[in-house]
């Protein structure tokens, strides 16, 4: 990873909430921003910030998520996801995260990612797939 990713570095991402990011299990009248979609959007915003500082052949994977979903966001509203680096410990990067829509704070917490060498990660995945295939026979 290139130097420069330090505590305090931040990124903001704005996303308009559509049906693909909303819950459906309570019916059309209760469609709101789904927690798994919010977490995915947080993860990608953090990843995008890391990728600005990644070397060729590097990427990052999520290690930990601790997020509170504080309020509903309706389809058509826009959320603003703000991520701020709290700490960089070697390849481990920790973030403070905040999500708000036009009216409320809707999410808050932390997320930690680990910068990986993609080639080594692919090898680990292939090795696990082979172990699973041998077990499943």
Predicted feature locations:
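C-terminal output/interaction extensions
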Residues: 112-137
């Amino acid at each position: 990873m290139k130097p420069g990713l330090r505590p305090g570095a931040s990124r903001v991402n704005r996303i308009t909430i559509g049906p693909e990011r909303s819950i459906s299990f309570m019916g059309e009248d209760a469609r709101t921003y789904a927690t798994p979609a919010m977490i995915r959007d947080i993860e990608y915003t953090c990843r995008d910030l890391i990728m600005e500082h990644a070397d060729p052949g590097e990427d990052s994977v999520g290690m930990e998520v601790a997020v509170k979903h504080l309020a509903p966001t309706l389809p058509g509203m826009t959320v603003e996801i703000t991520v701020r680096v709290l700490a960089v410990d070697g390849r481990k990067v920790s973030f403070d995260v905040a999500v708000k829509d036009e009216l409320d704070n809707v999410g808050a917490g932390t997320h930690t990612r680990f910068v990986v060498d993609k080639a080594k990660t692919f090898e680990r995945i292939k090795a696990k797939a082979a172990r699973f295939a041998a077990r499943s026979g």
